[in-house]
């Protein structure tokens, strides 16, 4: 069977892949094939914001990775949920819209990466965004990604913000604006009571384009190479190995784990690692698969009565959630429009720290080990 040929082949229909496919196919003369290992984003758990609590701790639309034992964590393993569906992790996460601090981007540029300063990337953030709350120099209107406050406003949110103020963290309505530090309600990627994932924002409106082909359940096996040039991607689908070719570029947007893994499977990486795994070395590139950095969550839980407007395991909580599910199904309103994580704060660990280095996430429920461990009752 002859391989189909496109101008661009994109591996991974996550946040980057969906946006890339949409932008590239704005030109009707450019053809794109987008490969996704997961399935279509049809599940109600994706579209109902509260469905995050069912997907993150399980393998529903989720790779649910475990790390190897970490020396810095006394040998413990870390849990790494990652989306496996159209939209990638934007289809299973808590939908919090949080940009990096200005310092982060300026630091990247200072390290020798032109085009990555805050002033360089801000117009791109604005172009992609439609913010229902803020229309100023820091936010966009009319973009595909809808950003708003959560429709369901639990009274418990106000208690968190009051507690933050008492402890010296003032209210900052827009942490994505001029100043990051402060306490706030999270801005979220919701639209009309549903999750606004990268797939829903960028991909779904453009699926009818004749120059865009989306292939789901396509597990990429390797990048095909001719000499030092990437020419396509071999992938498994339905038990068969297939190949798609690229005239211009092969773009890997399979995530922090998926992209380096595919490079290594293609023979691109540290020669010693590839030889140990029995992979022929095509290009000795020692940095592939190294230097992953991620933040760590420290979870603290406080018990609250079951009548509190929170999520929990109790008769009262179950009855409340059942009613909320019916309300959401009919009207796209109510408790199920909550991302569970509702408020937060950025602050400095010490007065002499230049930028906020600590982040708080306030959750309307007991979240132990990414909700993989359930507890009776209610808490925050």
Roles of regions detected by a PLM:
Residues 301-380:
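FAD cofactor-binding and catalytic pocket of flavoenzymes
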Residues 1-126, 284-285, 295-297, 301-304:
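N-terminal glycine-rich phosphate/pyrophosphate-binding loop and immediately adjacent elements
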Residues 42, 109-230, 234-238, 299-325:
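Conserved redox-cofactor binding core of oxidoreductases
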Residues 27, 31, 38-43, 223, ...:
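Glycine-rich loop(s) and the adjacent beta-strand/alpha-helix scaffold that form part
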Residues 49-51, 62-66, 186-190, 215-226, ...:
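A glycine-rich dinucleotide-binding beta-alpha-beta segment and adjacent secondary-structure elements
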């Amino acid at each position: 069977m002859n391989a189909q040929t496109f101008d661009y082949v994109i591996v991974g229909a996550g946040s980057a892949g969906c946006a890339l496919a949409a932008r590239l196919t704005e030109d009707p003369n450019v053809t794109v094939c987008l490969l996704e290992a997961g399935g279509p984003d049809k599940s109600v758990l994706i579209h109902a914001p509260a469905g995050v609590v069912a997907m993150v701790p399980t393998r529903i639309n989720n790779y649910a990775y475990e790390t190897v034992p970490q020396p810095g964590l006394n040998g413990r393993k870390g849990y790494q949920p990652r989306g496996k569906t159209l939209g990638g992790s934007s289809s299973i996460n808590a939908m919090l819209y949080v940009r990096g601090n200005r310092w982060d981007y300026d630091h990247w540029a200072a390290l020798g990466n032109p085009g990555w300063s805050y002033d360089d990337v801000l117009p791109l953030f604005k172009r992609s965004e439609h913010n229902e709350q803020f229309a100023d120099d820091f936010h966009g209107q009319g973009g595909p990604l809808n950003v708003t406050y959560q429709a369901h406003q639990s009274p418990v949110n106000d208690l968190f913000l009051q507690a933050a103020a008492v402890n010296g963290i003032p209210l900052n309505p827009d942490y994505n604006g001029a100043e990051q530090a402060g306490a706030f309600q999270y801005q979220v990627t919701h639209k009309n009571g549903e999750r606004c994932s990268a797939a829903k924002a960028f991909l779904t409106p453009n699926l009818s384009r004749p120059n865009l082909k989306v292939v789901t359940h396509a597990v990429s096996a390797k990048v095909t190479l001719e000499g030092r040039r990437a020419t396509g991607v071999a992938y498994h689908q339905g038990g068969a190995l297939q190949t798609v070719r690229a005239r211009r570029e092969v773009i890997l947007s399979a995530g922090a784990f998926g992209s380096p893994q595919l490079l290594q499977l293609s023979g691109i990486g540290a020669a010693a690692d590839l030889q140990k795994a029995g992979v022929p070395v095509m290009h000795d590139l020692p940095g592939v698969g190294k230097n992953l950095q991620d933040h760590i969550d420290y979870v603290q839980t406080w018990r609250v009565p079951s009548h509190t407007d929170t999520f929990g395991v109790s008769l009262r909580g179950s009855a409340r959630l059942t009613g909320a599910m019916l309300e959401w199904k009919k009207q796209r309103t109510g408790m199920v429009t909550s991302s569970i994580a509702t408020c937060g704060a950025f602050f400095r660990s010490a007065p002499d720290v230049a930028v906020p280095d600590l982040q708080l996430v306030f959750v309307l429920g007991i979240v132990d080990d990414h909700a993989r461990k359930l507890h009776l009752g209610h808490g925050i």
